[in-house]
């Protein structure tokens, strides 16, 4: 058995922090960003260094539910929860079906419909609110539909046209940005609940790529 006991070219392992947002909530922090992450982002922005934030879910909110009866809005074709996007539409990320955001619950007629969870769109909006001076790029399926848009976003970030790059797993593989000194994996345990017996392994792989 051959073991890798050190990194290639004697590369230094980065400092890794794991934050429990349940403890953050108890401390009064209701943000999607831990207090440590916010301080680290501020530090990098002040130094002129770049940041990458990874969340493996696009859209604005992970699902839409009725606050009265608990009904979750699902795709009529796939029977999975639909994702809310900032353009006011619900989309199925499996088959592509979409519809306008509902005003009343189809099960009980209640007008109390809420969005829950988070996606890359919500992260982008939160960054602009928390760090208004920062320039943010978002890279996911929604921002890379046009020809060459994938390369344009990466090139712009590499050239220093943005301080923070937010994206799904397409931002984590095969990229090397010299000025990136901070990487945040948001809701790192999200993929543990995927319908996949290798969910734990895949979650570890995605997290390890950043390190």
Q: What are these model-predicted stretches?
A:
Residues 1-208:
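Inter-lobe coupling/hinge segments of SF2-like helicase ATPases
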């Amino acid at each position: 058995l051959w073991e890798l006991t050190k990194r290639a070219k004697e590369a230094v392992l980065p400092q890794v922090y794991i934050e429990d947002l349940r403890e953050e909530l108890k401390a009064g922090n209701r943000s999607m960003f831990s207090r440590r992450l916010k301080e680290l982002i501020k530090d990098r922005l002040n130094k002129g260094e770049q940041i990458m934030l990874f969340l493996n879910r696009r859209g604005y909110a992970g699902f839409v539910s009725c606050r009265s009866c608990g009904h979750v809005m699902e795709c009529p074709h796939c029977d999975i929860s639909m994702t809310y996007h900032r353009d006011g539409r619900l989309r199925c990320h499996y088959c592509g079906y979409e519809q306008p955001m509902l005003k009343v619950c189809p099960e009980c007629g209640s007008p109390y419909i809420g969005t829950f969870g988070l996606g890359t769109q919500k992260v982008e909006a939160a960054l602009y609110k928390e760090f208004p001076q920062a320039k943010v790029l978002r890279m996911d399926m929604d921002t890379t539909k046009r020809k060459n848009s994938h390369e344009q976003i990466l090139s712009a970030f590499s050239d220093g046209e943005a301080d923070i790059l937010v994206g799904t797993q397409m931002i984590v593989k095969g990229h090397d940005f010299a000025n990136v000194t901070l990487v945040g994996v948001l809701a790192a345990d999200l993929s543990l609940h995927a319908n996949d017996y290798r969910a734990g392994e895949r979650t570890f792989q995605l997290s390890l790529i950043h390190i």
